[in-house]
Structure formats: C-alpha cells, structure tokens
C-alpha cells in the first residue's frame, strides 16, 4: 500500500495524473503527449487527401459549396442609419457655435455626429476660386476688353518648365519639413521681425527627437496637461502646440496647470488663473510630496474626465510644457513618491514614460519642448529656465535684465547688500561679500553671474510678470509678497493691540470706582 501511495503522489507532483494505458494517437517512446499535441497544431487547418491526392475532407473555409441562406426581410438593411431634419441640424449647429468657445463645455459622442455639416467654417467658405468676381469676361474678351494680351506666367515653354520645376522642388521641401518636423518647421513670422543669429545652446529643446517624443505623448493621451510657470505663464506657454491641438485634435482635452504658485503672491496666481480660464480650464498647483497645493483639485478633475469616458477601459494624461516647469514633480506629487527623475536643471527627462496613477488613469511624462519663435531673444530664453546656466558664455551680459525685472528691495534682502549703481557694481559687491575673488583681488564676474542666474531661475529672487489689469483680484503693489515670518509677526502685533484696547476701558472704570 505504501508503494501505491508513493506512486500516486509522484504522479500528482509531476502533473501526470492520467492512467498510463490511455495514450494520445502518435505518442510513443520518442514523442510524449505534449509534443504530439504541439505537432497536431501545425497539421490543423489543412485538407485531408487520399492516396490519389483527391480531397476527402475540405479545410475550413475551403469548400466552395455554400449553404442556402435567407436574409431577414427588414427595411433597416436598406435605409439610412442616422437621419436628422434640417431644423434640428440648424438648431444643433447654433447651440454648438454658442458653446464652442466655452472651455468648460465638453462635446460627447463626437464620432456619431456629422461634424462636416456642423462646422460653420467649412460650410460657409467655398473651395472654388472666385475668378469671375475679380475679373469678369467683359474685361478680358469682347469689344470692352481692357487688356490686349492675356496674363501668362512664362513667355516661353522653357521658362514655364524651369519655373514649374522650381516651384515643385520648393513645395516638396516644405512638405518633407512639415511631415518630419511638424510644428518644428513653423515659426511665428511677422512684418518687421528678422531671425537673429543665436548660440547653439539657445536651440535646446527643438531637436527632431524631442518633437517626436511630444507627438507620441499627444497621440497617446486623452487629456493633455500644459504645465506653466506661475511667474511667467504666457512666456512658458507653447502657443503653436495649443493651436495644433485645437485644429488637429479637437477631441482631446487640454488644461493648464500653473505650477510654482508658491513663488508668487496669492493675488497674482488668482489673477492669472482668472485670465487663462477664459481659454482653458486652469488650476494653480504647488508640487511637493510632503506639502502640496492643488493636488485634490487636479485629481478630482482627472476623475471627472474618467467619468466622461466610461466606454474606455482607462484614460491617459500627458504632461507637456517648457523644460524645468515641474512636469515630473507634479507626477511625483500625485503619486506621493519619487517615480520620475527630477532636477533643478532643464533636460533631466530624456524620453517619455508611463506611470500608473489609478486603475483607470495613467500618467505620461514628456521631455520639455521649446517652440521656435523669432520674437524670443536669448535673454528671454535664458530667464525661462530653458538653458543650463553653466553652458552660457559671458553670463554677466544678462545681469542688467535681472535688475530690470526684480525690485531693488528684494535683491537687497536676498544678498544683503545695498548702494550699487549698475550691474558691474552689483556683481563686484556680491563677489567681495562672498569672497569670490581671482588673482590680484579681482572679482570673479563669470562665476558670480552664473550664481545670480541660478538664483533667479530657481526662485531665490522674487519676481513675476504682472497679470493684465482687468484680471487683477486686488489692487496691490506688484511684487509685494510677504514672508510667513513677517505675516506672523504682524498678526501678533494686531492681536496685542486688540488686547490693549480691550484692557483700557476696564482700567478706566477701575479708576473711576
């Protein structure tokens, strides 16, 4: 009995519980059951033939004889699938036109709507050329003709061939540039603006690899979050990318997130949120794993988008924006742990990556992009944190721009100096205070300038771009941001004054008595 029990346990342990007398056809000493089933998988789906080669049993879908079938007599097979009257169509078109610019209205079931009929722009404009309106027949032919010769582009056949080949070559180059680089080939060109020569370092964030990463993130995302710097929201907004999404991907949701709102006064952040909310849903955010702001509002907004798309198993949320605006930091804040590499320098994120936030919500991190623009100077690009300061040549030439953007009192409080006349004097005073001197006691202008630029970009020096006047929440002096210690001190002084005022009437009554 012990031997049989051991044999039974051995079969269970090895997964061979079937009786040894029952075998699969083809199983022998050389092929076990698993190998025979694997080989039968390749033989399946073929026809069976006899010794003469005639087909005895046809393979699946090989037999030409079709069984007799009958289609159910239903008029829905031959009618229109979706029908709408002209009155309903015009009413829906008017309602769509009224709510089209409202960023808080979402159009559902876009795939089932005749968007070509609802789009007023496509229906209003005619694709045909208006030749007769510009030049009628009477001015070209007949007795009232105003010209003797027709206008032709070329005087000879050779000239026409050369001009055609040149135009075709230019068109092909433009098509190739737009297809490979997309938005990278588009620049904001206006009359009176010329493209100035810049250093190679100021073209960071414009490579083909970065734009390919951006397009992958946009194509894979259902909701796109554009991260802006609260100190300069309009400067760090990629206008060409937002226009591309509005025209090419209107079914994707785009929202703005004002990050680093802890570096500006509360009224400035509120004014920028009010101004940008007219275009897209906007949230104020402070990225921090331990002490964040706006995290609950952002998660609640993502849950609302998830509820809008109940038909999908999950939704993807992509983060785009300028370098060093805090895209990876926001993802770490939402996850409450470090899942993305972050650094106070631009270009830390090299490729896109997927992060799971919830069961139905996924996050996509994207490298920072810098759309090319002829309006942006080297100073503007540097002050937005796009370029690493240690790679900039002659950094002392950008210090006058910092002195214009920042208040004198903030610089005095940060570096504990006062009485400078210009940027050179400002750099020299900081160098001598910190002991950063070269041979002969000369100040290290380059090293101190890089330190000032890093302090400017990393928030150690208070500065911000003031919001539009009509969107200001309160009439306060720009840059008047109080530190927490000063606010607590003022609150304590006010409480002491109130206590003194309450004690004075009591003391007067005691004296009278």
From Swiss-Prot:
Keyword GTP-binding: yes
Name assigned to this protein: Nucleolar GTP-binding protein 2
Listed GO biological process terms: ribosome biogenesis
Gene3D superfamilies: 1.10.1580.10, P-loop containing nucleotide triphosphate hydrolases
Compositionally biased spans, kind Acidic residues: 487-504
Keywords: GTP-binding, Nucleotide-binding, Nucleus, Ribosome biogenesis
Gene Ontology, cellular component aspect: nucleolus
Domain of life from the UniProt record: Eukaryota
InterPro entries named in the record: G_CP_dom (IPR030378), GNL2_CP_dom (IPR024929), GTP-bd (IPR006073), GTP-bd_ortho_bundle_sf (IPR023179), NOG2_N_dom (IPR012971), P-loop_NTPase (IPR027417), TRAFAC_YlqF/YawG_RiboMat (IPR050755)
Keyword presence, Nucleotide-binding: yes
Positions that bind GTP: 321-328, 365-369
Compartment annotation: Nucleus, Nucleolus
Molecular function GO labels: GTP binding
Domain CP-type G residues, every copy: 211-372
Known function: GTPase that associates with pre-60S ribosomal subunits in the nucleolus and is required for their nuclear export and maturation.
Region (Disordered): 1-23, 459-513
Gene name for this UniProt entry: NOG2
Natural source organism: Kluyveromyces lactis (strain ATCC 8585 / CBS 2359 / DSM 70799 / NBRC 1267 / NRRL Y-1140 / WM37) (Yeast)
Biased composition (Basic and acidic residues): 468-486
Protein family per UniProt: Belongs to the TRAFAC class YlqF/YawG GTPase family. NOG2 subfamily.
């Amino acid at each position: 009995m012990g031997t049989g029990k051991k044999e039974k346990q051995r079969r269970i342990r090895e997964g061979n519980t079937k009786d040894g007398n029952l075998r699969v056809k083809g199983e022998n000493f050389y092929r076990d059951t698993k190998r025979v089933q694997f080989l039968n998988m390749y033989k399946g789906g073929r026809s069976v033939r006899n010794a003469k080669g005639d087909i005895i049993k046809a393979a699946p879908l090989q037999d030409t004889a079709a069984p007799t079938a009958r289609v159910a007599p239903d008029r829905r097979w031959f009618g229109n699938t979706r029908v709408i009257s002209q009155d309903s169509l015009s009413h829906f078109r008017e309602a769509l036109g009224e709510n089209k610019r409202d960023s808080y209205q979402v159009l559902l079931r876009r795939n089932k709507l005749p968007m070509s009929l609802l789009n007023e722009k496509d229906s209003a404009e005619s694709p045909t050329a208006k030749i007769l309106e510009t030049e009628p027949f009477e001015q070209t032919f007949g007795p009232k003709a105003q010209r003797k010769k027709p206008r032709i582009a070329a005087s000879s056949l050779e000239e026409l061939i050369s001009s055609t080949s040149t135009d075709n070559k230019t068109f092909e180059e433009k098509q190739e540039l737009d297809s490979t680089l997309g938005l990278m080939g588009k620049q904001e060109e206006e009359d009176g603006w010329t493209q100035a020569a810049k250093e190679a370092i100021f073209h960071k964030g414009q490579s083909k690899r970065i734009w390919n990463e951006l397009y992958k993130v946009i194509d894979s995302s259902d909701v796109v979050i554009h991260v802006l710097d609260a100190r300069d929201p309009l400067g760090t907004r990629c206008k060409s990318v937002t226009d591309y999404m509005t025209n090419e991907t209107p079914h994707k949701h785009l929202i703005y997130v004002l990050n680093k709102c802890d570096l500006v006064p509360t009224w400035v952040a509120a004014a920028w949120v009010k101004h940008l909310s007219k275009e897209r849903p906007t949230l104020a955010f402070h990225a921090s794993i331990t002490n964040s702001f706006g995290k609950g509002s952002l998660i609640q907004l993502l849950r609302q988008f998830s509820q809008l798309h109940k038909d999908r198993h999950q939704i993807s949320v992509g983060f785009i924006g300028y370098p060093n605006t805090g895209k990876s930091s926001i993802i770490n804040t939402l996850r409450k742990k470090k899942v993305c590499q972050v650094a106070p320098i631009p270009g830390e994120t090299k490729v896109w990556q997927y992060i799971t936030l919830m069961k139905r919500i996924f996050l996509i991190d994207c490298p920072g992009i810098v759309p090319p623009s002829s309006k942006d100077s080297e100073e503007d690009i540097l002050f937005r944190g796009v370029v690493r300061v240690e790679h900039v040549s002659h950094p002392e030439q950008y210090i006058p721009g910092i002195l214009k953007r920042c208040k004198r009192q903030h610089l005095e409080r940060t570096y504990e100096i006062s009485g400078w006349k210009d940027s050179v004097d400002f750099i020299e005073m900081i160098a001598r205070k910190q002991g950063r001197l070269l041979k002969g006691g000369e100040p290290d202008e380059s090293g101190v300038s890089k330190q000032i630029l890093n302090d400017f970009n990393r928030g150690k020096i208070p500065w911000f771009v003031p919001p539009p006047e009509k969107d200001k929440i309160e009439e306060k002096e720009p840059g008047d941001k109080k530190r927490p210690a000063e606010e607590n001190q003022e609150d304590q002084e006010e409480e002491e004054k109130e206590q003194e005022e309450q004690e004075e009437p009591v003391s007067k009554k005691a004296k009278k008595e």
